[in-house]
């Protein structure tokens, strides 16, 4: 869900914080991608007709694999260096929201059964989508696919969008791509919406910079976090009757939630009992993420592994898999493999237009250096992780408590 009404609020009160861009403007850039919503979208959209979905011979759904393959190929062909970040354990405060979603799915399942009984195809289509749930297997399938494609994968210890924001804050990536606006609340320096659109054509990419958001709203980061909590987020109830517009006015007037609560009309508004806004504030400011992160590395696709996984195990057309591999290789040859480079913003991006008539100052980073050949077996170490590399694979030897896991293609 993210932050209720934040997109509309920023469009009205911070229009200069959003910049329309082309996908090509991010050529050569390293972008962290929040995968959680993407996989859900694939399961809903790709190959679905009513209750019928794409499956392999074992009856297992493969829509997520088809969607992830196609989208990743298009991202690579655009010259973008993606790093896919997966959700870890949700914070305790989010479990109530997840329980609500589960109950809603259960209700949709009952509605779906009734729609099937009466043969209402429109309702079948509607309710079948509402019953979709992303499972651990869906996530593991996508991690395996991405690793075979030679693309870095990060398993976050907590929320993926929080980990993406940490990667951006620590200059491991140029920007993060997600549809959840709470990426800004977690402090993402540069946040992209619509970058991972299935077609790349439906909407231009919208780029937000948190510094410009704060400047135009006239708030500090702490006040912006309180604004988001008041507006409504995934981690606690908000005060009924207070939406984004009212929340912004109150924060500008009183500064922080404590002062807002003290000055609220007790007859008009009812503050939730034991409202954990302080814990939610701490979660946004200090989420469960890792900051000691090795450099990312992109490698050639494992053609044999992809054919075995997609064609042999999941009944994809072998010819289609080979064509996808050829596209990945062509993109890698064109933009080069290796480590991504991030350059400081110093010049305009070609073809970019600001919604406020101003253009941000940035330049495109050059492609990463071509990866040197590895020895057949190489042990790499960091302060927290050990990896063994055997050309294209890496196996973790150990990790500290609470540390994230990085896939095969994270170079140290």
Swiss-Prot record:
Region listing for N-domain, in residue ranges: 1-105
Record-linked InterPro entries: 5-3_exonuclease, 5-3_exonuclease_C_sf, Flap_endonuc, HhH2, PIN-like_dom_sf, XPG-I_dom, XPG/Rad2, XPG_CS
Modification after translation, per record: Phosphorylated. Phosphorylation upon DNA damage induces relocalization to the nuclear plasma.
Record region (I-domain): 123-254
Binding sites annotated in the UniProt record for Mg(2+) 2: 180, 182, 234
Assembly information from the UniProt record: Interacts with PCNA. Three molecules of FEN1 bind to one PCNA trimer with each molecule binding to one PCNA monomer. PCNA stimulates the nuclease activity without altering cleavage specificity.
PANTHER family according to UniProt: FLAP ENDONUCLEASE 1-B (PTHR11081:SF56), FLAP ENDONUCLEASE FAMILY MEMBER (PTHR11081)
UniProt protein name: Flap endonuclease 1-B
Source species of the chain: Oryza sativa subsp. japonica
């Amino acid at each position: 869900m993210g932050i209720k009404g934040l997109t509309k609020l920023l469009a009205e009160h911070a229009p200069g914080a959003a910049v329309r861009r082309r996908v090509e403007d991010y050529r050569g850039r390293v972008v962290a991608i929040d995968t959680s919503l993407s996989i859900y979208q694939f399961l809903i959209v790709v190959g679905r007709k009513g209750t019928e979905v794409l499956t392999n011979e074992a009856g297992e759904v493969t829509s997520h694999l088809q969607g992830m393959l196609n989208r990743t190929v298009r991202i690579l062909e655009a010259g973008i260096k993606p790093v896919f970040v997966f959700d870890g354990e949700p914070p305790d405060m989010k479990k109530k929201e997840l329980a609500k979603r589960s109950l809603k799915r259960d209700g949709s399942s009952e509605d779906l059964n009734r729609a099937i009984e009466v043969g209402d195809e429109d309702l079948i289509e509607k309710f079948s989508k509402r019953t979709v749930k992303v499972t651990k297997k869906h996530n593991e399938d996508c991690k395996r696919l991405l690793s075979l494609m030679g693309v870095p994968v990060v398993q976050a210890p907590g929320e993926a969008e929080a980990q993406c924001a940490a990667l951006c804050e620590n200059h491991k990536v140029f920007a993060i791509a997600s549809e959840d606006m709470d990426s800004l609340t977690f402090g993402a320096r540069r946040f992209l919406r619509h970058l991972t659109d299935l077609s790349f054509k439906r909407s231009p990419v919208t780029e937000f910079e948190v510094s410009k958001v704060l400047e135009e709203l006239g708030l500090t980061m702490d006040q912006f976090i309180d604004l988001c909590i008041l507006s409504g987020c995934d981690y606690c109830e908000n005060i009924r009757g207070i939406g984004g517009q009212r929340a912004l006015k109150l924060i500008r007037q009183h500064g922080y939630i404590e002062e807002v609560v003290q000055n609220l009309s007790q007859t008009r508004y009812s503050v939730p009992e034991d409202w954990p806004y302080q814990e939610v504030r701490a979660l946004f400011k200090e989420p469960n993420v890792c900051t000691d992160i090795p450099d990312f590395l992109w490698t050639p696709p494992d053609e044999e592994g992809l054919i075995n996984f997609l064609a042999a195990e999941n009944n994809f057309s072998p010819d289609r898999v080979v064509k996808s591999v050829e596209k990945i290789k062509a993109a890698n040859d064109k933009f080069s493999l290796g480590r991504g480079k991030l350059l400081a913003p110093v010049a305009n991006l070609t073809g970019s237009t600001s919604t406020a008539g101003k253009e941000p100052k940035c330049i495109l980073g050059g492609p990463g250096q071509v990866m040197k050949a590895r020895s057949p077996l190489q042990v790499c170490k960091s302060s927290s992780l050990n990896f063994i590399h055997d050309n294209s694979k890496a196996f973790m030897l150990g990790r500290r408590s609470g540390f994230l896991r990085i896939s095969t293609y994270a170079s140290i």
